[in-house]
Amino acid sequence: MKATRTDTMKNEIKYEKSELELMTTYQLREICRREKIMNGVIHPLDKEELIQTIMRYMGKRQDFLICDRKKGGEERVEEFLKNTRIVIKPSEELYCQSQILAYEGLSIEYYDGYTIPYKKELSGTNAFLMGSDMTLCAILNLKEHGGRQEKLYLTKAAELETRETQRKDYRIFCMGRQNSECMYHLYYGEQTILPEHIEVYSIPLIDFVVRKPVTLMLPMAIDFGSVNTTAGVYLDSAYFEHVGQQAAVKNCRENEINYTVFEDGAGESMLLPSVIGVLAVEEEDDKLLFGYDAIRLANASYVDEGFCVFYDVKRWIGEYDKEEEIVDRQGRRRLVKRAEILRRFFLYIIRKTENRFKCRISQVHISSPVKQKHYFRRMFREILPEYMTDQETMLDEGMAVLYNTISNMLEQETLEENEEYEALIIDCGGGTTDLCSYRFRIQDRRAAYKIYMETTYENGDTDFGGNNITYRIMQILKIALVRATGNQNVSSVKEILEYMDTDIYRFIDSHGVKAFYQYLEQEYQKAEETLPTRFADFERYNRSEYYKVKNNFYTLFNTAEQIKKLFYGKVGALEVTVTSEQKEQRENTVLLDKWKLSFWKGNSLTVEKMIPEVMMNYFEIELLLSGEIYGIVQKFMEELYHSGRIQDFSFIKLTGQSCKIDLFKDALKEFVPGRMIQFRKRANIDAADFELKMTCVDGALKYLRDRKYGLADIHLNNGKAVLPYRITAYTHNGKEVVLVDGIKDWDTAGTISRNMEDLILPLYLKNADGEEHCRFQYVCRQEDFSQKSYEEIEAVYGSHILQKETDSIENGDVKFFVWAEQEEWGFQVVPVYCEMDELYLGKAEFFSFESDNWVNSFFDGKK
């Protein structure tokens, strides 16, 4: 048997995996010998390993699809089709809709509904929509979708041009893979030898219409999350009058909110993973992948092969002007500003929305975190200036959630006019959790509602979110795999969970969350000796071992994420099986790619070819996660409970996708009556139920709609935020001084004095319990000072630097003034020096409370 192969321009033979699987071990070794794949010749590999090795170095590229603009490409294709001999093959069984409708600058996707009957030889090929005069009107792709082989979908990249002809007589030329690949190389200027004739299937088309997309009146809304991002638009009647009833919008709802959907490989999802991957580093334009495409990039890499994927990119906002090193599989690298990468991520979402709803977006509303509202808005003003709406009327995430609640209560007529309501919202997202309080009241005027809303940031945890839950599952998975492969030095999952099976809430009240997970952490570190995931520790090892360990982490973390979704995305998933073998179709099974995991065997990292199945049940996972979830609820609610403030709130709302876990509600009941908690979890929900995640988008769009149509006069106000940090320093004699106390009062500037030399002032960021998070250094140099009068200093810094404080500075001393900046979520340090009774003002420096230096990241290679 011979393998199916493709001869490219350089005469390299490429092999298909499906054909290799039918060959004998001897035939596979012969391919390795012939193709000089030394790893398959020297080492005694079995059949699976030989196939993996051949596919790595000589695997056929699956599809050669024309998906982007190449100067002169369309002209070359059109000229060839006009001048070559075209042989029409019989195609009675092939047909398409009588009319195709395209929009200028927008793509045609599977949801547009243009299909032809399935024909294997046409799957993954290019098709050419031609006019009767052989004018090339559009370049299309024929693709399968959702793993079904009933039909092929006609799609088109947004970058490719479309045109109509005078005569309404069109046809679609479809061709086999070899001819399609030839046209691909011709389009990109790579093919020099062209066939004398080309065989095609010709599908008649009555009409091909190209329209201009409609511009939406309202902004689109984006909820940028640590793990997932969502987006949506409000479609009014005017929109439907313009676009008509074509397939693309037949499932859209008129005068309602409609969500952007993203293709996840098996279907469509309203959630886009906030993940960015690097496909290629090029001088002109780096090729980046987003969401599911970025995750597939990481999953497609070989065990010791490099890949560059960024998770948790929402944390970049605090330091968006920093640079990140991007690297592709060829090892090419360069530095790119975070702001530029984020801009391209949001443009991707905007383009997906435009393509989905056949429209143009003129404005974008992006909900911001409550505590970083002003910093967040400034960043988006810089990276997306062409899309920014009125900054002053943009909602933060909590306010958007609250407005959605108010809107629903108005529809249900459950709000009393002029009564002041107080709400407490716990937003547990993928990477962070925030607690905010809100006051609101409404007045029903003749023309519109008048709504007053005030928000106050109460507390937060930058290190707790859905990723923590995934990480805990990953820890148990890693330990189970190490035990399953024969290492009995690590305790079993059963033994670990038996240790944790106690009166969890009271144990954490007395000993804390760290003590609850101490035994788990201890055994997890033992498992690291067999199945390493701390790839940061391997940066000094060779490239191959570094990427093996990096693949270990991402494979286990992504598998744990799938396990979490099965348990908490679908009611009834009481048990999940993790297996490396593709067996009969079983419900609630996660397939673990054994080729991506490397275990220590002696002094080398090797693939474990036989990985036994691992079973996890719902009750084990509930026990595992109870400590984390109670810990965060206790942190937020205990002070409110003991002070009695909890009774002031009309209701408590849980939002964020992680909050659909029942453990949150159970933990809250320790502090408040259950009927106060607004917790949405309908019976028989499935994995497509994203209601909690969509609340922020819903609220933002309802707010934008009500303002635009004059349905509500909305007044927004920000209360004084509670800062969960303290800034301290030490005097010359070792006494600690609190410069900023966010727990008590952070409006007042703190001061500390030093003798003037070129000195370094250490500053300490601590939490409410006095635990140190981070150390900052302010470097003070004499050349940075300039002489100023107090009046000049006051004109710049106002009440932050009082005259009585500057008058007390002795000659030769410098006094540091430190105060918090609520809007910037950080603090300022300004030195004032006195010499010969004259004042000198030093350089001001701003420090962010939350930075890469201390905020916990699950993707830094240290887990």
What are these model-predicted stretches?
Residues V209-H242, E305-C308, K314, L410-E454, ...:
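Gly/Thr-rich phosphate-binding beta-strand-loop-beta motif of the actin/hexokinase/Hsp70
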Residues T192-M217, T393-I426, K693-L711:
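Conserved phosphate-binding catalytic cores of ATP/NTP-utilizing and phosphoryl-transfer enzymes
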Residues L65-Q191, T485-Y505, Q678-D807:
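Acidic, glycine/GT-rich loop-and beta-edge segments that sit at the periphery of enzyme/chaperone cores
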Residues L342, T470-Q475, I479, Y517-H715:
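Helical "lid/coupling" subdomains associated with nucleotide-phosphate turnover
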Residues K2-D68:
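Basic helix-extension-helix modules of the SAP/HeH family
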Residues D68-C182, K250-V364, S368, K478-E561, ...:
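Phosphate-binding loop and its immediate beta->loop->alpha context
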Residues T353-R360, V370, F376-E420:
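Hydrophobic, small-residue-rich alpha-helical packing segments that form membrane-like cores
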Residues S237-L271, E419, R446-N459, R680-I685:
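Flexible phosphate/Mg2+-sensing switch loops adjacent to catalytic phosphate-binding sites
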